[in-house]
Amino acid sequence: MAQSFKRVFLVVMDSVGIGEAPDAEQFGDLGAHTLGHIAEQRNGLNMPHLAQLGLSHIEPVQGVSADAAPIASFGKMEEVSAGKDTMTGHWEIMGLRIDTPFRVFEKFPEDLIGRLETFSGRKIIGNKPASGTEILDELGQEHVDTGALIVYTSADSVLQIAAHEEVVPLEELYRICEYARDITRDDPYMLGRIIARPFLGEQGAWVRTSNRHDYALKPFDRTVMNELETAGLDVISLGKIADIFDGEGVTDAIRTKSNMDGMDQLVKQLDRDFTGLCFLNLVDFDALFGHRRDPQGYGQALEEFDARLLEVFERLQEDDLLIITADHGNDPVHPGTDHTREYVPLLVYSKSGAAKDLGIRSTFADLGATVADNFNVKMPAHGKSFLSEL
């Protein structure tokens, strides 16, 4: 039954894939199955609320029962865009199709490093994938002693520049990052984000400050979020959603410190009266466990998330819609440290709706189309609404 929901709560479990996509081989990801492999490694996952919603009706997950009739509609979605990074996944969810993938570098090319050194007048050290705290432990003192800029990346499309605020003034760091942003918008670099990472302190006690600044790419076209904002509806970003969309279409942005903080913020929004979309990204699955190839930690984080769903269920109103999905895979048993090209789960729950099999959706954009359809705003160019199937 098609029905208009006053509030839509969209939760992206960052990197929680549910099995190799049809084109997985092109990405080197044959056999990837984030949820399945975590469940195997832990001899089953204890996730009674996701079981209730119908997770194992999409694809059997060890320990997650499919015995009872699900209370939510369920299915899985295939990505059609050319990349498997966070920005690509989220942009496609909101109705865009990305045909030129953002680039991910193990090491930035000498040409790019040379241009940054010439512009800044400073040497560059690092130039490798690293966690922000580890790279400071390793290179922080050298930076303070020499004034060289610390450049590092991750398994996402990002270039980060760290500098001590007493060595490189903030305005100078921001100016360098703006230059980096300008020269990496297109091929051959095509980077999703440049991040200024200022810090203070001394060896053994470095502290990253709140003066971080992200220089993202704006979505190349209007997304469903833009259409909601234009229509005067609320678009509440929780976690890194606002960064992913460079603030486009966001009416209220609330940062989060962790998955559990994200769930705390979600509960607060459930207690708030608004009309529109509340969009949450839970990044710990990806950042702390997927890239670090830690299936035990990943499994524990999934179970902790599941335990919090009861608070969500209790607060949902009759005219609320809860959608749980992911943006790509990151199988912690798969070789390497990169994302994996997978289907993502789709669980759609309302207290007033029946449970339907939504099948395999041919693009993540079906989700955005459904949100647009619900609020009677302009439909995205990509995606087919499943609102009438609920």
Curated annotation (Swiss-Prot):
It comes from the Bacteria. It is found in: Cytoplasm. InterPro entries: Alkaline_phosphatase_core_sf, DeoB, Metalloenzyme, Phosphopentomutase_DeoB_cap_sf. The keyword Isomerase applies. GO terms for biological process: 2-deoxyribose 1-phosphate catabolic process; 5-phosphoribose 1-diphosphate biosynthetic process; metabolic compound salvage; nucleotide metabolic process. GO terms for cellular component: cytosol. Mn(2+) 1 binds at D14, D327, H328. It is an enzyme of class 5 (isomerase). Binds 2 manganese ions. Its cofactor is Mn(2+). Signal peptide: none annotated. The keyword Chloroplast does not apply. Mn(2+) 2 binds at D286, H291, H339. Keywords: Cytoplasm, Isomerase, Manganese, Metal-binding. Pfam families: Metalloenzyme. Its EC number is 5.4.2.7. Pathway: Carbohydrate degradation; 2-deoxy-D-ribose 1-phosphate degradation; D-glyceraldehyde 3-phosphate and acetaldehyde from 2-deoxy-alpha-D-ribose 1-phosphate: step 1/2. Belongs to the phosphopentomutase family. HAMAP family: Phosphopentomut. Isomerase that catalyzes the conversion of deoxy-ribose 1-phosphate (dRib-1-P) and ribose 1-phosphate (Rib-1-P) to deoxy-ribose 5-phosphate (dRib-5-P) and ribose 5-phosphate (Rib-5-P), respectively. This is Phosphopentomutase.
